[in-house]
Amino acid sequence: KGGLKWLGQAGKMINTAEGTIDHYRDPNYTGKGITDVAERFATSITRIDHCVGDILQTIKDLKIDKNTIVIFSSDNGPHREAYIKGKRWSPSVFQSAGTFKGSKGSSYEGGLRVPTFAWGPSRIKSGKKSNSPSQFHDWMATFCDYAGVNAPARIDGVSLVPTLNRTGKQRKGIVYVEFNNQQGLYLDGYKGLRMKATGHAVDFEIFNTIDDGPESKNLAGTNEDFNRLQKRMKAEVLRIRMPNKHAKKSYDGELVPGLDISKKDLSNGVAVKTYLGEWDWVPEFTQMSAEASSLEKNINLKSLPAEKNAGLLFSGYIQIPEPGDWTFHCEASGSLIFKIHNKLVIDGDYKYDGTEISTTLKLDRGIHPYRLYYKTSAKKPSLSLQWEGSSVAKGLIPADALLVQGEQKR
């Protein structure tokens, strides 16, 4: 009873497949002394449960269950909106967040940490549980992995197949959130949380969310290890996030710190790996086997193995000589992705027309890791990466500013 049906009429998306519209309540929840909104809420959750069961049974009936993966999750914790004029609702009515603090819109676990069920009879063992934090962007990489295609280089996610299948080694992913003045990051098994990040000097609260789900014990400042972790968290959030003009933050003007690496451990050069293949997007070359690798003095196409159906991955470190605004300019015949630290700096992939793309970052003096991905097109290959600083004219990045790890031989 109840349900929905497609009418194809504007404004008629709320209807009923059977019975009187806006009327059905699951009999398990009527006459129990709860509010009308609570009856609606419980009915909706139960309907979802039944529908998921229907989907799984249909998959089995079609005999495709051995070749199917189903993921069921949520985008946030319990909400406080009633969605009915004049009615009120509290996320605590059915204790939907369990022992967690917070709700939808909060960066506490009650707002962020949602249950996820993975079902795949031929791959995923039932009854297993993982407390490893992951984020929505990991699912695209995961589905690409299951489908046997290379994930796009532009995404932040990592495949969760090793965790789901209990095989291989799980790569570390990025779990980072910011909303209004809230900021959260998972690092080294701990969660850093700033509920009022009015400036970058504000310290993170630090929680062990596995043993302390309610986030009741702030570990920040309790010993030198957590003092060091505090410093790393403050540096890492600047290396991950990109300012957004539509959601300005008080820490947008902070300089991105370089890595704590001695230049003595580096040498001049660019690490280059070559790939052959036909891809619909710039793939994540770091998760693929390279045809060959070499060391070049600068970024060029000398190592390109073919003019068509080929790709290059340039990587290493850029030595930034002075703090301030640094603009990077990319132009290519083909497609490209440019990252510094874990930031997507330039996206020249989908619908890229070959014109110059520029992005400005606030970088501190020091050593910053980069990756430049290039995929050939049907035209003659070409690629250019330039930089520009307050006292550095626009031009190709000089060879003495491009570094790689250790002593390298060309």
Protein language model regions, located:
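Short, solvent-exposed loop/turn segments at the edges of secondary structure
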Residues: 95, 109-113, 134, 155, ...
